A protein has these predicted regions:
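A structural signal for short, well-ordered beta-strand segments and their strand-loop junctions
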Residues: 3-5, 50, 105
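Surface-exposed extracellular loop regions of Gram-negative outer-membrane beta-barrel proteins
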Residues: 3-18
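Beta-sheet repeat architectures centered on beta-propellers
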Residues: 11, 23, 32-36, 43, ...
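Phosphoinositide-binding peripheral membrane targeting modules
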Residues: 15-29
Length: 174
C-alpha cells in the first residue's frame, strides 16, 4: 500500500489485483478526512504519525479492527491531553526507536518536546526538555552503534549572546 497525505485527508493507494501497483490496477480510497500539516510524517511500528492540518495536533493513522468486526484505517489524536505544549505550531517531528520508543518534536517557538509512545503497553507520555536560555531549531535521529542518536541544532545564550551549534543527546543507563 502507498499512503498519500494532503491538507484535506489521508488516502490509501493499493492494487486491485495481486502484484505491483500499476495505472491499470490502481485503487485510491480516502481513509480519514483529518488533513495534514506541512511537516514530514514519520513511520512507527504501529502506523504513520503526522501533524494535523492546523499544525498543533499529533495524530496516528493506523489499521484497526473495530468492535463491530469492521476493519480499516483510523486516526487517533495522540496529543489530546497535551494541547498546552503546542500553543505554537509543530515544526519537525522525528522517531527514535531505540533505546525507547520516543517521538521528538520541535515547535515553531523553539521548544523540544518528547513523546514516549509504546502502543502495546498503552504508554503515551509527554516530556519537555527546555532549559532556560536555550532555543531548539531542528532535530534528527541517526542510527548509532547500539541505539538511535538524537541530534539537535540548538542555540544557547552564553557570554551575552546566542551561539548555535549541533549537539547529540546520548542515552546512558543509570
Amino acid at each position: 500500500d502507498l499512503f498519500i497525505g494532503t491538507n484535506g485527508g489521508e488516502w490509501r493507494c493499493f492494487q486491485s489485483e495481486s502484484g505491483v501497483i500499476t495505472p491499470e490496477n490502481l485503487n485510491i480510497e480516502l481513509q480519514t478526512s483529518i488533513g495534514g500539516y506541512k511537516c514530514k510524517p514519520v513511520i512507527t511500528p504501529h502506523g504513520i504519525v503526522f501533524v494535523q492540518k492546523h499544525g498543533a495536533t499529533i495524530r496516528e493513522l493506523a489499521y484497526n479492527v473495530l468492535a463491530n468486526s469492521t476493519e480499516g484505517y483510523s486516526s487517533e489524536n495522540l496529543s489530546i491531553l497535551a494541547e498546552h505544549l503546542f500553543e505554537n505550531n509543530i515544526k519537525r517531528i522525528v522517531y527514535q526507536a531505540e533505546p525507547y520508543s520516543i517521538l521528538w518534536i520541535v515547535t515553531e517557538d523553539f521548544k523540544l518536546v518528547g513523546l514516549t509512545y509504546i502502543k502495546e503497553h498503552e504508554i503515551i507520555a509527554f516530556h519537555t526538555h527546555n532549559p532556560s536560555n536555550t532555543l531548539y531549531h531542528d532535530v534528527a535521529v541517526i542510527p548509532g552503534f547500539l541505539n538511535d542518536e538524537l541530534w539537535v541544532t540548538v542555540s544557547r545564550y552564553l557570554d551575552g549572546q546566542y551561539k548555535t551549534h549541533q549537539e547529540v543527546l546520548v542515552w546512558r543507563p543509570l
